[in-house]
Structure formats: structure tokens, C-alpha cells
Amino acid sequence: MSRRIVGGPRAVGLVLIAAACAGCSAPAKAPAAGGVMARAVVDPYLKVQAALVADSIDGVRANAGAIATAATTLGAPAVKIDTAALQLAAAGDLAEAREKFGTLSEAIDTYMTGLKLTPPEGVRVAFCPMVQKPWMQDGSTLANPYYGSSMLTCGSFRN
């Protein structure tokens, strides 16, 4: 007895594709416009910012990796965050970490602006006129991660 496949070769192809992707999970969607930036990105970002303010790279690699992992859950618009975080994780010294942190900060700022997201409560966005880059930080006293102790209060808050 022969079996007839209902739907023909195209249907079989679709079934095979569906079966192959059964274990696949679609990336999470970006936060709704007008929402709050994901804490999974912001919390490790703030740890990196604090380390750079202290003229240190302790914990930068691990926290940048956490940012990259979190960014992958935000969907396609966050690909620049993921890429910048991975570059920061590979930084070999303080100067390079600060440079890559600037790239990451710009990527996050662009993502947040594009989706009209705000930082979580208590987190503010600041801007350094010397490097022309933003950063996020806790608290109301400027703590510039691009220059650390040499120019700790250089910059201004945007929000």
C-alpha cells in the first residue's frame, strides 16, 4: 500500500522547516515605545561605569558580557549594543575600555532614543563634552567614566 502525502512537496518542506525550528526560540521583542530601558542591560552597565570612574577595569569583562547577553533578548534593534558590549569585554586596558564604553554608551543612547525609552528610576543620562559621548549613572553627582579621577565631574546631566 502506498502512502500519499497530502499537500505535495511544498507542504513537506514546510513541515520539515517547522520541525527543524521546533527548538528555536524567537528573540524577545524590544520594550514598547515610551517604556523603561531593561534593567538586565542597565545594572551591569552601571557596574562598568563605576569601575571606570574608579580608574579600574575590575569586573568590566564580566559585566560587558552580561550586557551582551541581555542585549540579545531585546531583538534586532539592539544588535549594536550586543556588538559594542562584546568589544568592551575584549578591551585590554583602561584606555581601551573607556573608548569601547563610549561606543557602548552611544549604542544604548541611540536605542533608547529610537524607542523613546527612559532610564530606570534613579538612573540619569549625562554627557561628556570632551569625548562628545553620553553615559548613564546612578545618583545626582557627576561621575565621569571617560576620565575617572582626573576629571570626575566633567559633563552635565541631560535628564
Labelled PLM ranges:
Residues 29-33:
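Compositionally biased, proline/threonine/alanine/serine-rich low-complexity intrinsically disordered stretches
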Residues 25-27:
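Bacterial signal peptide processing site
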Residues 19-23:
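C-terminal motif of bacterial Sec signal peptides marking the signal peptidase cleavage site
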Residues 34-159:
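Mature extracytoplasmic or organellar-lumen-exposed domains after removal of signal/transit peptides
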Residues 2-16:
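Bacterial N-terminal signal peptides that target proteins for export
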